[in-house]
Regions:
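Conserved active-site alpha-helix within GNAT-family acetyltransferase domains
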Residues: 114, 126, 137-155
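Conserved acyl-donor/pantetheine-binding loop and adjacent beta-alpha core of acyl/acetyltransferases
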Residues: 67-100
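Conserved GNAT acetyl-CoA-binding A-motif
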Residues: 95-96, 124-136
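Conserved acetyl-CoA-binding loop-helix of GNAT-fold acetyltransferases
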Residues: 103, 109-122
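A short beta-loop-alpha structural element at the N-terminal edge
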Residues: 6-23
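Conserved beta-strand-loop-alpha-helix junction that forms the acyl-donor binding cleft
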Residues: 105-108, 133-143, 160
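Active-site rim helix/loop that mediates acceptor-substrate recognition in acyltransferases
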Residues: 32-58, 67-70
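Glycine-rich phosphate/pyrophosphate-binding loop shared by adenosine-nucleotide-utilizing enzymes
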Residues: 6-8, 60-65, 96
Length: 162
């Protein structure tokens, strides 16, 4: 049963939360989910060791998570080849990338995703970083969610030819 937003607590993720976050990630995979990372939460965590991590708790249980990190803008450009898509480097030296977010299906649509994303954004601002999120352009749910929070589409589209 869904909880009221007032009963949700956002806090920093600790090691004891990793198993639950991995479980939530598995619960959220399916036909209605677009995955921007080609691997699981466990693999992501093992490779990237994210520097920004939050969980949402309801009644003392973890019901959602968000993870990502802050990198220097120059490194961000080389990773995503976005050299000509951002503001001049003198404006924003640090970029906070929100990489993964997961909400237990039983606790959706009560503001947890919004609260986690806001916490991530505040942490980026605290560290003097701009916040960026990569999403598939046909992920209408995520696009609508992000736009409702004030994010704008950067207009970047990656084309490919196999």
């Amino acid at each position: 049963m869904a909880q009221k937003k007032g009963e949700i607590k956002i806090r920093k993720m600790v090691e004891a939360d990793l198993e639950t976050a991995a479980h939530i990630d598995k619960l959220t995979r399916g036909d209605d989910r677009f995955t921007t990372w080609p691997f699981s939460f466990e693999s992501y965590w093992g490779i990237y060791h994210p520097s920004i991590t939050f969980v949402a708790e309801a009644d003392g249980n973890v019901v959602g998570f968000v993870v990502g990190g802050i990198i220097k803008r120059k490194e961000s450009q080389s990773i995503f080849n976005l050299l000509h898509t951002e503001e001049p480097s003198s404006l924003h030296q640090l970029v906070g990338w929100m990489d993964m977010i997961g909400i237990d299906p039983e606790h959706r649509n009560i503001g947890i995703g919004r609260s986690l994303t806001e916490s991530f954004y505040r942490e980026c601002k605290r560290r003097n970083a701009v916040m960026r999120i990569i999403a598939y352009n046909n992920d209408e749910k995520l696009a609508g969610f992000l736009e409702s929070m004030g994010f704008t589409n950067s207009g970047v589209v990656i084309y490919k030819k196999d």
